[in-house]
Curated annotation (Swiss-Prot):
Pfam families: Pkinase. Transmembrane segments: none annotated. Its EC number is 2.7.11.1. GO terms for molecular function: ATP binding; protein serine kinase activity; protein serine/threonine kinase activity; protein tyrosine kinase activity. Residues 485-616 are annotated as: Disordered. The gene is HIPK4. It is found in: Cytoplasm. GO terms for cellular component: cytoplasm; nucleus. This is Homeodomain-interacting protein kinase 4. The keyword Protein biosynthesis does not apply. Residues 496-511 have a biased composition (Polar residues). Residues 11-347 form the Protein kinase domain. Keywords: ATP-binding, Cytoplasm, Kinase, Nucleotide-binding, Phosphoprotein, Serine/threonine-protein kinase, Transferase. Protein kinase that phosphorylates TP53, and thus induces TP53 repression of BIRC5 promoter. May act as a corepressor of transcription factors (Potential).
Length: 616
């Protein structure tokens, strides 16, 4: 067992958690405290020296943050010797990608997605206060702290790609954001700001629900094509201003066309670049609204007599999709900010409370909401309060005092659920097409194992009238996308340079949108009331770049395109005085009508008829 030491402490290296191109992450024992830590180890050379200096600068900027309240990883110390650099962080359990992999990439319930989203938004809000862009938000960089003791409590990690707005030119990263989570302004070469992280978080939310990346592009053309096919083309003025528009779009040959631009066809792209576009999506959505129809999301709306619990869960999912739509806009100026997202009804549970407060689903969601914000040794500190000023988490406590808590706690709905081991998706809904990826990201097979996802729903509707006969929905079953073995995501052949740093919008500490007075009449009007966010994160990055933060990964994502840092200008763009309109994708068509079923009289109908005939 190797040993290394700083000026003040000594560390025993227990095991190597992961290795990367430029270093490794090891699990170590800190002798002074007896705690296990994560040690990020990089070789001592000129290139890595610049990387370390950038990360240390950001960690220094965040030294005043409380890592627990800000949901960022706790940094302990840095030291070096003649051969290596060492950064010591707290040891966390696993990242969201590893968690998904353990559970066969089964869809995560909306209430758990809210718990994760809330914490990441708090982190982004605090980073914005410090004028920091994370620039590499993805499942691998969101870590579960301790899933047994604190379910779905997370922290943001890996600040190797992060940058301070005013000093972003000194960041030596060869790319901005991992491709699957890359914002349109980065893809198109438009001015960008901290809202690139909001786009990434929206993609992560969709992926947690789908069990598969929303836009898993093999290259930037595929990435833009996927977004266009789901959300429609960007507005013409966006493409007029975009430096890289000609890479993906061409002028419309029809002068009378509504949009003077059109997306290049796959054949055009192949002829120009000799690179064949690939289809790697599992769910080919024609609008973001269709997200709620995947993985049984619309079951409650199609039941003859929907259960209250099913209705509550479906309403929650619908609210989540509305937030995702606000996060995934072509135009960054139309995109919701972290502080406004914290007040969105999905995150604050405002709509759920108003319409479904008496359901077990609401109580369970409330409990998860409260626990995610609770810091050990401190009372829970709510981010969002009810309209009357009462913190939402107290609603559950008041009900427990009134005797309702005992009923809720004894209910099977309050048992901590594990994600099912198999995905279940409903086919032939609207225009949604389910398709096995022609080129698997992780490998994928079909099985005959039936998902147990609907077990809680079936239990909830026990005793209610169900149709006696009728066709069942056509189901598509997907097993682990690892195909029973851990297969690495292989990077595509041939990367192209991609310089994006010249697009930066230099921001002040507070955006103009946050200076408006809060009238409190709606969640959007109070968007400047951001929640506290906090410090950075550590150890983890897949094969997307030189930093080795995500080394615990067995499966790696493809390498995004690189850019030449020397091409970055030294001058900064002034804040633009133009305002662009957002683009909303086409809305999904209504669900096809179900076939009518012969139903018996509802419960209680016989006694009612007897009552009527008895009076006549």
């Amino acid at each position: 067992m190797a040993t290394t030491q700083s000026e003040t402490d000594c560390y025993d290296i227990i095991e190597v958690l992961g290795k990367g191109t430029f270093g490794e992450v090891a699990k170590g024992w800190r002798r002074s405290t007896g705690e296990m830590v994560a040690i990020k180890i990089l070789k001592n050379d000129a290139y890595r020296n610049r990387i370390i200096k950038n990360e240390l600068k950001l960690l220094h900027c965040m030294r005043g943050l409380d890592p627990e309240e800000a949901h960022v990883i706790r940094f302990l110390e840095f030291f070096h010797d003649a051969l290596k650099f060492y950064l010591v962080f707290e040891l966390l359990e696993q990242n969201l990608f590893e968690f998904q992999k353990e559970n066969n990439f089964a869809p995560l319930p909306a209430r758990h997605i809210r718990t994760v989203t809330l914490q990441v938004l708090r982190a982004l809000a605090r980073l914005k206060e410090l004028a920091i862009i994370h620039a590499d938000l993805k499942p691998e960089n969101i870590m579960l702290v301790d899933q047994t003791r604190c379910p779905f409590r997370v922290k943001v990690i890996d600040f190797g790609s992060a940058s301070i707005f005013s000093e972003v030119r000194y960041v030596k990263e060869p790319y901005i954001q991992s491709r699957f989570y890359r914002a349109p302004e980065i893809l198109l070469g438009l001015p960008f700001c901290e809202k690139v992280d909001v786009w990434s978080l929206g993609c992560v939310m969709a992926e947690l629900h789908l069990g598969w990346p929303l836009y898993p592009g093999n290259n930037e053309y595929d990435q833009v094509r996927y977004i266009c096919e789901t959300q429609g083309l960007p507005k013409p003025h966006l493409l007029h201003a975009a430096r890289k528009a000609h890479h993906f779009f061409k002028r419309n040959p029809h002068p009378d066309a509504a949009n003077p631009w059109q997306l290049k066809s796959s054949a055009d792209y192949l002829a120009e670049t000799k690179v064949r576009p690939l289809e790697r999506r599992k769910y080919m959505l024609k609008s973001l609204d269709q997200i709620e129809t995947v993985n049984g999301g619309s079951v409650a709306s199609r039941l003859t007599f929907p259960d209250r619990e099913a209705l509550a869960e479906h309403a929650d999912l619908k609210s989540m999709v509305e937030l995702i739509k606000r996060m995934l806009t072509w135009e960054s100026h139309e995109r919701i900010s972290p502080s406004a997202a914290l007040r969105h009804p999905f995150v604050s549970m405002q709509q759920l409370r108003n319409a479904h407060e008496t359901t077990h689903y609401y109580q369970l969601s409330l409990r998860s909401y409260r626990l995610s914000l609770q810091v050990e040794g401190k009372p829970p500190a709510p981010v969002v309060a009810a309209e009357d000023g009462t913190p939402y988490y107290r609603l559950a406590e008041e009900k427990e005092a009134a005797g309702m808590g005992s009923v809720a706690s004894s209910s099977p709905f309050f048992r901590e659920e594990k994600a099912p081991g198999m995905q279940r998706a409903i086919d032939q809904l609207d225009d949604l097409s389910l398709q096995e990826a022609g080129h698997g990201l992780w490998g994928e097979t079909c099985t005959d194992v039936v998902s147990d996802m609907m077990a809680p729903l079936k239990a909830a509707i026990t005793g209610r009238h169900m149709p006696d006969s009728g066709p069942e929905p056509i189901l598509a079953f997907y097993s682990s996308r690892l195909a029973g073995r851990h297969k690495a995501r292989k990077p595509p052949a041939g990367s192209k340079s991609d310089s994006n740093l010249s697009n930066l919008i230099r921001l002040s500490q507070v955006s103009p949108e946050d200076d408006r007075p809060c009238r409190g009449s709606s969640w959007e009007e109070g968007e400047h009331l951001g929640a506290s966010a906090e410090p950075p994160a550590i150890l983890q990055r897949d094969g997307d770049g030189p930093n080795i933060d995500n080394m615990t990964m067995e499966a790696e994502r493809p390498d995004p395109e690189l850019f030449d840092p020397s091409s970055c200008p030294g001058e900064w763009l002034s804040e633009p005085d133009w305002t662009l309109e957002g683009v909303r994708g086409p809305r999904a068509q209504g669900l096809p009508p179900r076939r009518s079923h012969q139903h018996g009289p509802p419960r209680g109908a016989t006694s009612f008829l007897q009552h009527v005939t008895g009076h006549h």
